[in-house]
Amino acid sequence: FISLMKVLPVPMRFAKPGARLLALIKPQFEAGREDVGKGGVVRDEAVRERVCRDVAAWLDGQGWAVQGLTTSPITGPEGNVEFLIAAQRAS
């Protein structure tokens, strides 16, 4: 269970200007333990929204422009709602 904000910095260093990123935001990996319910499911929509905002803001701070964010059509095995985020590295 590792946050995108901990996993992505190393591979992002190798991305050339204009590179594109598509990542799966798994709220149960991004939210604090107090926000994750039984079975690892984040049921609170406000927590899911906060997680998406946090990841988008982090990407922006790393020099990546968020181009889109959408709910994944596939839920996690326990019913977690997950999100796809697209971003492009500044030229």
Language-model segments: what does each one mean?
Residues 5-22:
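A short glycine-rich, Lys/Arg-flanked "PGG" loop and its adjoining helix->strand segment in the class I
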